Amino acid sequence: MIATQRPFPIPSPVPLAPSSTVLPTTVPENAPEHCPGVESSQAGKADACEGCPNQSVCAEGPKGPDPDLPLIRERMSSVRRKILVLSGKGGVGKSTFTAGLSWALAADEECQAGIMDIDICGPSIPLLMGLESSTIHTSASGWSPAYALDNLAVMSIGFLLPSSSDAVIWRGPKKNGLIKQFLKDVEWGDLDYMVVDTPPGTSDEHLSIVQYLKEAGIDGAVLVTTPQEVALQDVRKEIDFCKKVGIPILGLVENMSGFVCPNCKNESQIFAPTTGGAEAMGKELGIELLGKVPLDPRIGMTCDQGMSFLDEYPESPATMAYLDIVQRIREILDDE
């Protein structure tokens, strides 16, 4: 089954409140691929609008402040820290790092943490957190997230798909509408940290989360890369994106930084940092290297099983790296 541009059908276990719909109808059926949506201030003016039969109608339509922004601001007021996890390229372990970071935060029972998965077309967080069979329910106060732990809430489009193999093929406005609902309609409760897992690159999802969270406050972004120059090159673009939209950069994380033998614990290089890796790039650009997470094959195994690698293998150098990174992030945010 393929999810298309039609309004998204929620599985039957998830009743919706009468006042809410899953996706707003903000894009005409015959709109171009990158339509900004009829409610956008760029409606009828963006480059994507050229040649669209609706261009003049959209350009002349009434524009005003987004009425949902105050609702988002109110909902997010109960979230103390909001952290984006970004990567310039897919396959560097961004979602795996998001899961590890969240497990590490939630290891403190006094800490309330949450994951918002806005990788709309490739949601892997449900699998990584052991929540593939979870469904979302709604109440008068909004959608209830799934819980990996009592103090670790998770929301993902993966919970709304009939099958984990279903493709999501949506234009930008449809994705934006769902992200907005994750922000304003999910009953997150009081959180100390919200970790936002984003798609690779700089896409509609990134622009949406920045736009919607701007007033509520984004505390910063963690950029994940591997040691190779092909990954670092795209991280430079991600850094440029953060600077242009005003997102503070908390620091870099070099993932798959060497290989740790599960038996002898010795570490060896697999992906050689031919240009110095994240450490050299951080020094060049004045961005802190938060840490290096070595490649432990047991990380992949625990991810497939939806288990916390940190709990299962506390003696691993990778676990130590995660805990050090979390400690450094806390120090940076507490100093602000």
Swiss-Prot record:
Cofactor: [4Fe-4S] cluster
Keyword list, A-Z: 4Fe-4S, ATP-binding, Cytoplasm, Iron, Iron-sulfur, Metal-binding, Nucleotide-binding
GO cellular component, one term: cytosol
Record-annotated membrane-spanning stretches: none
Keyword Metal-binding appears in the UniProt entry: yes
Gene Ontology molecular function terms on file: 4 iron, 4 sulfur cluster binding; ATP binding; ATP-dependent FeS chaperone activity; iron-sulfur cluster binding; metal ion binding
Cofactor annotation remark: Binds 4 [4Fe-4S] clusters per heterotetramer. Contains two stable clusters in the N-termini of NBP35 and two labile, bridging clusters between subunits of the NBP35-CFD1 heterotetramer.
InterPro entries: Mrp-like_CS, Mrp/NBP35_ATP-bd, NUBP1/Nbp35, P-loop_NTPase, YlxH/NBP35
Keyword check for 4Fe-4S: yes
UniProt-listed PROSITE patterns: MRP (PS01215)
Gene3D superfamilies, sorted: P-loop containing nucleotide triphosphate hydrolases (3.40.50.300)
Main location: cytoplasm
Localisation: Cytoplasm
One Gene Ontology term from the biological process aspect of the record: iron-sulfur cluster assembly
Record-listed [4Fe-4S] cluster 1 binding positions: 35, 49, 52, 58
Residues bound to [4Fe-4S] cluster 2: 261, 264
Entry binding sites for ATP: 88-95
Region spans: Disordered: 1-20
Subunit structure: Heterotetramer of 2 NBP35 and 2 CFD1 chains.
Role of this protein: Component of the cytosolic iron-sulfur (Fe/S) protein assembly (CIA) machinery. Required for maturation of extramitochondrial Fe-S proteins. The NBP35-CFD1 heterotetramer forms a Fe-S scaffold complex, mediating the de novo assembly of an Fe-S cluster and its transfer to target apoproteins.
Family according to the record: Belongs to the Mrp/NBP35 ATP-binding proteins family. NUBP1/NBP35 subfamily.
UniProt name for this protein: Cytosolic Fe-S cluster assembly factor NBP35
Lineage, top ranks: Eukaryota, Fungi, Dikarya, Basidiomycota, Agaricomycotina
Recorded name of the encoding gene: NBP35
